[in-house]
Amino acid sequence: MTSRQGRQAIAATAAMGVAVALALPTAAFAQSATQGKETATTTSSGTTYYVSSAHGDDANAGTSENAPWKSLTKVNDIASDLGPGDSVLLEYGSEFNDQYLHIKDTAGNADAPITISAYGDADEGKPVIASNGVKGSQWEQDYRANVGNHKNKGTVSTTLLLKDVSYITVSNLEITNDDADVYDPIDTWKWTDTPDSDGTKLDRSASRMDRTGVAGIAENGATMSNVTLDNLYIHDVDGNIYNKHMANGGIYFMAHYPMENTSAETDVWLREHVSRFDHVTIRNSTVKDVDRWGIAVGYTAYLNYIDANYGDGSIDDALIAKYGSTNVRIENNYVKGAGGDAITLMYCDRPVIEHNVGDSVSKHINTQDYTQPGSYGGRVAAGIWPWRCKDPVFQYNEMYNNLNAEHGNGDGQAWDADYGDGTLYQYNYSYGNSFASLMICNWYAVNTTFRYNISQNDRQGVFDLPSNGPGNHIYNNTVYVDADSQVLTKRSNSQSLFENNIFINATNTKKTETWNRGSQNGGQTYDNNMYVNYANKPTSDANAIEADDVSAVLAGAGSAPTSALKSGAEHARTGEKAAFDGYRPVAGSKAINAGKVVSDLNDYAVENDFLGNAVKGRPDLGAVESDVVSVTMASSKYETGTETDSGTGDKTKVIHVTFTDKNPVTVKELLSNVSADKGVDKAVYRVADAKSGKSADARSAESEPNMLDRLLSLLPGSDRNAKDDETKLADSEPVRDGDILRFSAEGTDETDEYTIRQRITWDWVADYEQGVADFDWKAQRRTSAGGEWTTISAYDGSWPNTVYDQYYGVGVNGTLAELSGDRKQTHGLLIDKPGDGLPTAMAWKAPESGTVMLSLKTFADKIAEPYLRQNADNAGKKVTLSLMRNDETLCSADDLSVYQKSSEQFAQCLAEHGSIDVQEGDWIRIVADAETGVKAPSLHISPVITYEDKAPAAPKQNVRYDVSYAATDAVVGTQSAVAAAFTADGGEADAPDGVAFAFKDGGDEGEASPVIDASTGAVTFTPAAGQYGATVTRTVVVTYADGSSDETTVTFRVAQSHAQRLNVLYPTVRGDAGTDLKRTPKFTLKADGAAASVPEGTTFALGANAPAGASVDMANGTVTLNSGVGGTVTVPVTVTFADDGASVSSTARFEVTAPAALGSSELETATVDGVNVVYAPFSADSPMTVAQLLAKVTAEPSGADKGVYRDGVRLEAGAELAENDVLRFSAKGSTVSDDYVVKSKTTWDWVNDFQVRVQGPIWYGQRQTEADGVWSDIADFDATYPNWMYETYYGPGVDYANHSLPTDRSAIHGLISDSPASAGGSAMAWKAPKAGTVKVSIREDEPYLRQDGSNGKALTLRLMHDDKVVCFADLTVSKQRSEEFANCVADKGEIAVEAGDWIRVTATSASGMNKPSAHISPVIAYMAASTPGPEPVPVDKSTLKATVEEALGLAESDYTDESWAALVAARDAAQTVLDDDAATAEQVETAQNALRDAIDGLEKKPVDPDPNPKPDPNPDPDPTPDPDPDPGPDTKPGDGSGNGSGTGNGSGSGNGSTGSGSDGATTGGKLTATGADVAGAAAMVALTAAAGIGLAAAARRRR
């Protein structure tokens, strides 16, 4: 199907049922016809399962209403075993809290789909599934490919997951995925200057888990089809604000690769195993208060094939059909309060999106909520729109109040044709959207049609045209613009053609509008629009219609709805509740029948208006047609225009008809190619000769066979529309120059007439119009080698020519101003882009059959055309100029290489081939093809085409007849036959006598080739075994008796083999290790995913490298696995089919759960050569105990046992670890354990340790979002380069070209960068796994700014211990090592740490810095000499904590000063013990006894007789402040000494005894006390000493 035919078909198909749709209510979430008592329809062939939260029991069978299950756990257990006709019905009124429904790897079929719905009394309300993000609802999403710059994998919580499921219908459910800590309902939402001051709660973290209400995932390399969601209520899905293309929002369908593309072999495999969607329908549903998307369908990992070459933005039909989603319909839905976009279709082929309502979306796309602008996708959201779709249709939708363009939303439009091809918006209504009505977004948005829409009070503009591509056509819309808005947004700068629109300035004062902004792709062009209440109009609109008062044009413009209906239904367009009648034209309106007959730039046929009225004949202006009949004609064949009488100035309409005396056009032929409204007559009249009183060319009856008809037409009353001096011509009469074509309306005096003008000559130069495609001439080029010719629709903004790639195109020489003058000396201009193999052409389409003469315009005293017009040394490289008829090259010239040298070859070409026989619709092209190296490929050439007065040759039989063969299905081993079919004059015909048939490639090729009967043309074919699935096509040459010939093709489609048409799938099985786990295969059709039966004779065998404990039943394919280990175990299976003996591979996947397993770990783990490893920081002189290791890991489940074994013997808690010990997690009574071999690791290297998209547990990529703010992990990872990323470019990582990091990284540097546009910084962060002293080092040549182009502003590097700065330096010069920083790290890189401390290398960019990126590669190693012994095992402090809380609850006023002071001292000492992680059991007991004694020793205070105690007569007016806790890097070193001393188990010194400044603990370690610390703690010395607590511990608590 051609693009033109396809788009016409789309428009027709999408409009089907419009009258019905408009006449019926379209509630967005209407119940079924059995309102209040709806039940699901089930199929007797399947099983129905019932679930009731109120009346069920999971011990029931679940297969009757009287014995339903209680929980969805039972459904999830059998979900993958659901098959054709099976139903799962949830009882109305049920609530399934903290539950979910995940259906995977199964299918129904066309006759018996799987059904998920409700049963019972609908008055009880839809059954509710509320997953609330619980662990079971979580799954790991992974596209297995880069998807632009977006996040491509992560954990997602989904309430209803449909994964690789076909033929399934889900209906009548309420679905939520709520987070109790998030509260932001749209019904109470409002913008506030302070976040959350309106009572909302929001998690703005970029690392927040993604959530979905319903997710559809295609992942198995096949088509997931026939999925219907109907009558769902999805709300409160509290997903991630930022992530656009994870399963994150209300409803989201997306396709993944089944495997990563890692080699040429996998690339070939992926191209033939495409995960995609077909026939997805989402209807009658409400989606409210979800993040991020409302409804989205089609995002795909296969964008890497679709977008491999954006080209000019056009999308290849075959490409999108293969890799994109097809037959997608989104209809009658209501989306309100989505955090981001309302409804988006992505990578879809011709989807239809209709009767939907969007309301108050983009709730969180603002500067207060979207606080991490570097997160994927950016702070932009539109309403209802496509991304990279082919010919999508959006119609009968309403969009209200897309939010936040004034608060940071970079979009904010109702509609957005984004990076797509052929987008059609029609019959839509937008109101109050915060930015605009329509955006056509950027370079690769091409060929958009926007027609018969209404925009009312969209706030910052109506049309947003930022750098869009060409081919965009905006016509017959009505836009109502208030005081604060405008027609074009301020950023608009690119192409669109505006025709037949009504622009209304809704203010009380005439407005001067900016009608043109920018000139990209030719900028904006206007024709035949109406401008109401404007002080100016576009200069390009020569046919502008102006009006002062809108009430004289439309019945009530501005009165359309200002909000969505609460029900979510569309507003009525007809009937008593019609909401848009204010946009109907009033009687006598200038808009009525004032439109031009538009030829849609994108070939969409015009059928009806905004209200569903048919559009015929000459249309009205604006979006709504009146019922006033238009007598104006329309024609796609004949060009019309006006002639102006030079004397009177009167204008006469003319129609240009091509005929000569010997090649006439009859009245019948003319009338068959013009049309008008229903009820309009059309006829041709001839004016009588004034002198003779006879018709202007009266002939004798003998010479004119139709004279009787003529005479009859002259009888009185024969034609009331004929004027006195006119004769109505009979159908068979040839028309003449000066005849009148007249249209007249029944019952009225309304007429419209055109004088027929003979046109037989076309002159490229004279006919050229800037910005308007000529009726017959076109500027064209090929867009692919040997491909279709396409019209160049963009025009140069400065010169009179069409343009592509900035410099190339077709037009005329001179300036735009010179177009209005005499063009006698003007040349045609033809410029092809050198070297791309895609030629450029002046193209003329023949309006009639006949013979034409092509010549070139001549110029007196000038070089004969064609020639190169620009002086340049082309070094012998040339432009080839060809004359073509359709795709046939008649002749060529290759002598165009020298400036202003006429082409003798082309002159000879025209002399020999300039007289050309054409059929109507043939293309004559003058084609330029410049080879690589031509510096100035611009040609002067000015073609003129004239019909010769020759009778058209009698058509050859190959012209009169068409012959074809129907495509025929064939089966291997069975003969199929097909006959040749002839047509002539539009109908079936017998084969003409003497016709002969033969294959073009000669004789037959044996039994596996088709055989043709030479006399009848019948073709037979018996496919051989090797031709399963083949399409066998042969070219047939048909030779007629008159010597003419034609070619056609005969095609046989051989049925596929079982291997070709079937998928063999094993749904995933989950179970415990040590038990028999079983899975039987499922067979589905590759074409649509429908369930299929197992072909007879199919056998199964284990594939290569099957794991231990696996077996397969040879006959039925059941795989059994008894695994001794946990984890994911895959069993390869080879499936062999009986029909052709072909084998296919499948895989049974088992998620084996060990009875016990590692839960979480603060230490690094890995799998090395198939063995699990845990890395622990110990060495011979820095040991680590078993207890310390076990404290850093958890078991799953939490009650499982964990221990360390050596040679099979369990070690005691105090035993020191050794290499190859085994960390084991086990369950009582099980022989299966989860084991990790212990390995020592005491050195960490940022570069060597770096892992793509892995944070922790030792190294992290972090950032601050404000100066001196809290450090947080960076959630996003660059899609191409190996680094953590925020704000698109910045963060820490390693400097390498891609994610595939090599094993040897010695030549790779660490990399850190920070955004100069925001506060804070980025960090390479290391978390200490144990206490000790570490040495930080960097490479000898580091650090330095890694990129040229620094501008003198600084990137500040710091080495930090927790929040203390150890070293810092400013990097300002590109590629110059910072000696200051390197020396500081060498001097001060030894740092005493406690377990859990942070060492960070940070980068902070100065505002406005260029290239804020440095090379630095930190290495951190424990120093053996200063590594402390084992950390103390934590002791029980619960009793002491309770006693402290008891003391805090006492009131000082009740007790004597002396006893109270003793209590305070004991309480503070006890608090110090609580705060000390190293406190021993003895210290805890001592503190507990002392505090208990102090409580027991409290003495009650006697009653104070003085009710007015006197104030302190000598208060301290200037209390001494605490010393600065962070003096910064300029502080002088101090000796770290203090004036106090302490005794007990903790001493007043630590591993590092020397600090700096007033706080010696800055670099001296956490056990160091400073002078200021000691002085401040003097009052506590005695008690802390008595309690056995060192002074350092007290000081540490105060810090």
UniProtKB/Swiss-Prot annotation:
PbH1 repeat ranges per the UniProt record: 165-190, 224-255, 277-299, 325-347, 348-388, 389-437, 469-506
Outcome reported for the amino acid change (mutating K244A): Greatly reduced catalytic activity toward pNP-LNB
Phenotype for D418 to A/N: Greatly reduced catalytic activity toward pNP-LNB
Domain (FIVAR): residue spans on this chain: 1436-1498
Post-translational modification: Predicted to be exported by the Tat system. The position of the signal peptide cleavage has not been experimentally proven.
Low complexity: bias regions: 1559-1568
GO BP field: polysaccharide catabolic process
Signal peptide residue numbers: 1-30
Cellular location(s): Cell membrane
CC per GO annotation: plasma membrane
pH and activity: Optimum pH is 5.4 with LNB-beta-pNP (beta-D-Gal-(1->3)-beta-D-GlcNAc-pNP) as chromogenic substrate.
Transmembrane feature ranges: 1574-1594
Active site: D411, D418
SUPFAM superfamilies recorded: Pectin lyase-like
Class in the EC hierarchy, top level: hydrolase
Alphabetized Pfam families for the sequence: FIVAR, RibLong
Enzyme Commission number: 3.2.1.140
Cofactor(s) listed: Ca(2+); Mg(2+)
GO MF term set: hydrolase activity, acting on glycosyl bonds; metal ion binding
Recorded domain comment: The region of amino acids 31-625 was identified as the minimum catalytic unit exhibiting full activity.
Miscellaneous field: Breast-fed infants have gut microbiota that are substantially more rich in bifidobacteria compared with the mix-fed infants. Notably, B.longum was found to significantly dominate among members of the genus Bifidobacterium in the breast-fed infants.
Function: Present in the infant gut, this enzyme is involved in the assimilation of type-1 human milk oligosaccharides (HMOs). It hydrolyzes via a retaining mechanism the beta-D-GlcNAc-(1->3)-beta-D-Gal linkage in lacto-N-tetraose (LNT or beta-D-Gal-(1->3)-beta-D-GlcNAc-(1->3)-beta-D-Gal-(1->4)-D-Glc), an abundant HMO unique to human breast milk, releasing lacto-N-biose (LNB or beta-D-Gal-(1->3)-D-GlcNAc) and lactose.
Oligomer status and interactors: Homodimer.
Protein name: Lacto-N-biosidase
Organism name: Bifidobacterium longum subsp. longum (strain ATCC 15707 / DSM 20219 / JCM 1217 / NCTC 11818 / E194b)
Native organism taxonomy: Bacteria, Bacillati, Actinomycetota, Actinomycetes, Bifidobacteriales
Gene name as annotated: lnbX
